[in-house]
Design a protein with these regions (language model features):
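Preference for long, amphipathic alpha-helical scaffolds in soluble/luminal domains
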Residues: 1-262
Length: 262
């Protein structure tokens, strides 16, 4: 009825207003909130800074993340793997039908670092789901398996191929890093296939493209982290080429950054 419609519209206006950000010269609308991603990266940063797991701040963060693992809903990903047991995390609040392996790997790595015994079951379910989401070519897409219908990219409104979710180096690197952290080396089929995929994806200049961040700097450091985690020879020529490429992109102020145009 009209009254219910008005209440719903008011609710959605408030929601969308939260996505708007303004400063003195411009404004923009972010597409969504990212609490899972932000909390897990924040937790990693706190651990790198030496915060003990017993600290209430970190304990609250890891417990909050553990409670949000999607264990009972088979989302859109199940179309390509209906028998796979759920076990991922989503990027946003309450998005049970679209967990992604990138968030899942980062969260599971944090839980493993913080307290592998306390979060043993969450890590186990994440491992099963991440391995099950690996594509035939050895890589991982963010949300789907073997989503490589490249003909769709020729549709005029496809926007850099965003209609698809093919395997990418950045996401694949995160999955390899997770599997390496929980004890799987090159003897593990998923890790071995993932590394082979990453080697094939390296650009001629030594870099890797990262789809979910800007762009080659993001992809390259992500892959280098994975190669280091899995125990690759960091003096191997292909790795040194990537390192030199990354060093050459350092800015005059000492930082790294990359324009979206790349």
């Amino acid at each position: 009825n009209a009254e219910q419609s008005q209440r719903a519209l008011k609710k959605y206006r408030i929601f969308f207003a939260k996505l708007l950000t303004f400063n003195d010269v411009e404004g923009y609308c972010q597409p969504c909130l990212s609490p899972i991603w932000d909390t897990s990266l924040g937790g990693h940063a706190l651990m790198e800074a030496g915060l003990d797991i017993g600290e209430k701040t970190l304990q609250a963060a890891t417990d909050w993340l553990a409670e949000r693992q999607i264990l009972d809903v088979k989302g859109d990903w199940a179309v390509n793997h209906p028998d796979l047991q759920p076990g991922g995390w989503a990027f946003q609040y309450n998005n049970d039908y679209y967990p992604d392996v990138d968030d899942t790997a980062v969260v599971a790595m944090l839980l493993h670092r913080a307290d592998p015994e306390r979060y043993k079951e969450q890590i186990r379910r994440a491992e099963i789901w991440v391995i099950g989401m690996q594509s035939k070519n050895g890589g991982w897409g963010a949300f789907d398996i073997d989503n490589e219908y490249y003909l769709l990219q020729h549709i005029p409104f496809a926007d850099h191929g965003a209609l698809l979710d093919p395997p990418t180096a950045d996401v694949s690197a995160r999955c390899v890093s997770f599997l390496a952290q929980i004890g799987h080396g090159m003897e593990h089929q998923s890790v071995r296939r993932g590394i082979e995929y990453l080697k094939r994806e390296q650009e001629p200049d030594g870099s890797w493209f990262g789809r979910w961040g800007n762009n080659y700097v993001y992809g390259t450091w992500s892959v280098l982290c994975a190669l280091n985690a899995v125990g690759e020879d960091m003096n191997a020529p292909y790795i040194r080429k990537a390192v030199e490429w990354l060093r050459a992109r350092q800015g005059a102020d000492g930082g790294w950054g990359e324009d979206c145009a790349s």
